[in-house]
Amino acid sequence: MEMILISLCLTTLLAFLFLKPLLKRITTTKPKLPPSPWRLPVIGNLHQLGPNPHRYLHSLSLRYGPLMLLHFGRVPVLVVSCPDVTNDIMKTHDLKFANRPKSKAINIFMEGGRDIIFGPYGEDWKSMKSLGVVHLLNNKMVRSFENLREEEIKVMTEKLEEASSSSSSVNLSKLLMTLTNDIICRITLGRKYNEEEGGIDIKNLVMTSSEFFGKFFFGDFIPSLAWIDWISGIDDKMKDINNKLDCFLDSMVQEHVDADHKEPSDFIDMLLLIQKDKTKRFKFDRSDLILILKDMFFSGTATTASQLEWTMTELMRHPECMKKLQDEINSFSTHNLNVTEKEVEKMNYLHCVIKEGLRLHPSGPLLFRLPSEDVQLKGYDISAGTHVIINAWALQRNPAIWGLDANEYRPERHFWYEFGFQRTDSKFVPFGAGRRLCPGIGFSLVLSKLALANLVKRFNWRLKVGPVGDDKPDLAEASGIDVCRKFPLIVFPSIAHTH
């Protein structure tokens, strides 16, 4: 009897062990995943990205749908190209999607992502962001630097006047980059730092650093191939550049500490003043301060310059829009001097021109998110840790939203399309939306409008000297995840005699 019981128990145990995986397979509901294109072993769908990922992802979405699942190596990637799902991510489930994926560049330049742009959502991140939004980039602070912006734009227009008087060409791309960098330097550090001023070329240092954020690293997606990044030398190169940038910014902070200004005159002074305030609950050290400064340079230099560069490109391609804008500017700025910010505030068509440039050429065409927990989107199961890419470039060229002429440059459309920058609007997201909305919108727009108004009022523009022909700049894009011109915008300015 005892042997029978032992045999029965063993049989039951073996049956249970054998049937458990089978029962689990039967009873467990298989997750419902979005459509996916066929992928290769090891690399997944990486081979399908191409030189301009926003365009290639858009092409794939036309075939597989506005919600599709790709695999970049071992990493699952959800690509979103429709406004309703974008709204779910940035509004309905904004808290679940408040994080951003990390990368090797973020780990090196931003200490693993402890800054405002890439930091994980939480109390520390909210406190650090408030330093930028409440103390540094609020409307009052942006307006306080009005004279500074007008001074630097005067420097730019004087250079253009010199080129005009000698019929010389100008690298407008480089000039706009210098403008934005010099303004950010003065606002952040207290003065300009460039080769012309006899100092370090901070512009080149920032631009070289920024380029790494758009590069592909094997280790980010295929850990077993991380050694390729190491032997290529890119790791050491990033660390070397980051060390130079950190040393420079640290020396700037120390210079301000030694000066001990009683009245703050720039961002470093303000941050040091906040740091001394014992009533503040959030405490930050020197490394946190340097990360905030990096955020200011990385997010403010190239993006604003690129916006202006593309807008000038489109205006030169559409002389009727250039003329309409010139007429509006001259109707409010009736003197022969530079346009002021107070005059710019009255110009509605100028606002439309800026918005149309951002719609067609967003400097950040792909918005990245990382869900902190499992979530359902349109009936599909999305696992925590899935990388999410919102194709803002595709959203802002969607014919269902913008009409059949969605790919055409037409600033007038913004007179009746009431899509704002500050709202969580999933159809127009050049600065992102939700908790990850870019805090520097006000700074960028004020500078873009003022610079563009002066470029258009003071000068006429040609690609070449001679008879007017097919004198239009191209729209070729550089390779990478940012939408930048492939070739610099080389132009011939001439004084516009309008009064």
Swiss-Prot record:
Cellular localisation: Membrane
Enzyme Commission designation: 1.14.-.-
Binding site for heme: 438
Membrane topology: Single-pass membrane protein
One GO CC term, this protein: membrane
Needed co-factor(s): heme
Main location: membrane
Top-level enzyme category: oxidoreductase
Matching Pfam families: p450
Entry's transmembrane regions: 3-23
GO molecular-function terms, A-Z: heme binding; iron ion binding; monooxygenase activity; oxidoreductase activity, acting on paired donors, with incorporation or reduction of molecular oxygen
Family label: Belongs to the cytochrome P450 family.
PANTHER family found in the cross-reference section: CYTOCHROME P450 71A2-LIKE, CYTOCHROME P450 FAMILY 71 PROTEIN
Protein name: Cytochrome P450 71A27
Organism encoding this protein: Arabidopsis thaliana (Mouse-ear cress)
